């Protein structure tokens, strides 16, 4: 199994370590590779789009010619997990809590509507306990950093976890989106669930 991690910015190293732990837990002989240009997508079984600044990630991905290829592969069934800014990249509809509608480059493959900076600047970073029973796990302490919120889901998209009634983890077929940072959590539950998607 080969998993690619988009490596322009964001926590590549932390996702790498969480994936390694999840591989070890499941006794999977897996390979993890950084993805920056289209040829890096060759032969991968799944891809992670980490946090960072979603507009920057989108612009760089577009400039390097990977944005359209990613969209094509994800639409054709490549398993993907987008965390925080990565979730924004996957959404079909994006607006900003302060400035309203945005026109940033997106993959736009998931039937969700996302509001960037949902919790406001004063809550730039916080931790919260969420219930992961819908993915067969217990409660987990997770980290939110300038987090967006999934405010609308349609089609086959399901909400898998909520915080105060707002979706923080959603799934649609081969696509998983989290508004928190699972790579900074002390549990590998989310990465394990992603590997379960990859294994099919």
From Swiss-Prot:
GO terms for cellular component: cytosol; glutaminase complex. Pfam families: SNO. InterPro entries: Class_I_gatase-like, PdxT/SNO, PdxT/SNO_CS. Gene3D superfamilies: 3.40.50.880. GO terms for biological process: glutamine catabolic process; pyridoxal phosphate biosynthetic process; pyridoxine metabolic process. L-glutamine binds at residues 52-54, 116, 145-146. Pathway: Cofactor biosynthesis; pyridoxal 5'-phosphate biosynthesis. Keywords: Glutamine amidotransferase, Hydrolase, Lyase, Pyridoxal phosphate. One of its GO terms (molecular function) is pyridoxal 5'-phosphate synthase (glutamine hydrolysing) activity. It catalyses: aldehydo-D-ribose 5-phosphate + D-glyceraldehyde 3-phosphate + L-glutamine = pyridoxal 5'-phosphate + L-glutamate + phosphate + 3 H2O + H(+); L-glutamine + H2O = L-glutamate + NH4(+). The active site is at residues 84, 181, 183. Its EC number is 4.3.3.6, 3.5.1.2. Catalyzes the hydrolysis of glutamine to glutamate and ammonia as part of the biosynthesis of pyridoxal 5'-phosphate. The resulting ammonia molecule is channeled to the active site of PdxS. In the presence of PdxS, forms a dodecamer of heterodimers. Only shows activity in the heterodimer. Belongs to the glutaminase PdxT/SNO family. This is Pyridoxal 5'-phosphate synthase subunit PdxT. It comes from Saccharolobus islandicus (strain Y.N.15.51 / Yellowstone #2) (Sulfolobus islandicus). The gene is pdxT.
């Amino acid at each position: 199994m080969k998993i690619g991690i988009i490596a322009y910015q964001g926590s590549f190293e932390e996702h790498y370590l969480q994936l390694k732990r999840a591989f070890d837990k499941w006794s999977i002989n897996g390979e993890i590779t950084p993805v920056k240009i289209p040829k890096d997508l060759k032969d991968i079984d799944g891809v992670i789009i980490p946090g960072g600044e979603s507009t920057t990630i989108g612009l760089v991905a577009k400039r390097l010619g990977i944005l359209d290829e990613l969209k094509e592969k994800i639409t054709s069934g490549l398993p993907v997990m987008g965390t925080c800014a990565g979730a924004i990249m996957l959404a079909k509809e994006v607006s900003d809590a302060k400035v309203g509608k945005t026109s940033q480059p997106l993959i736009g493959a998931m039937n969700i509507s996302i509001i960037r900076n949902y919790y406001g600047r004063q809550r730039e970073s916080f931790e919260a306990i969420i219930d992961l029973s819908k993915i067969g796990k217990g409660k987990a302490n997770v980290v939110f950093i300038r987090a967006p919120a999934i405010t609308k889901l349609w089609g086959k998209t399901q909400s898998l976890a909520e915080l105060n009634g707002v979706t923080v983890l959603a799934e649609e077929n081969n696509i998983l989106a989290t508004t928190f940072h699972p790579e900074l959590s002390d549990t590998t539950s989310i990465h394990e669930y992603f590997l379960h998607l990859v294994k099919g």
